[in-house]
């Protein structure tokens, strides 16, 4: 069940931007023991959003909306989170949908 706080304070993170896989590209990792997990997620592309923008102001900066196949390596996540800096090795390239839509 989705925690109630997610409706007012959604879970978000900023990942590295090393590029994306194509929609049909294979997901290649050194070992399946890393715990490969695929997650369908929504991607929102914005232009420059000013710091401290309200949700209403930020919504005016949305340029594109699409789907992304987010790839996680579950076996690496606990150790990374324990370091206090978030995801890096546990988040390889994700696969971007071939189509994005304007809002």
Segments the model singles out, each with a brief description of its role:
Residues 1-103:
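Glycine-enriched loop-and-adjacent helix/strand subsegments that border the catalytic/binding cleft
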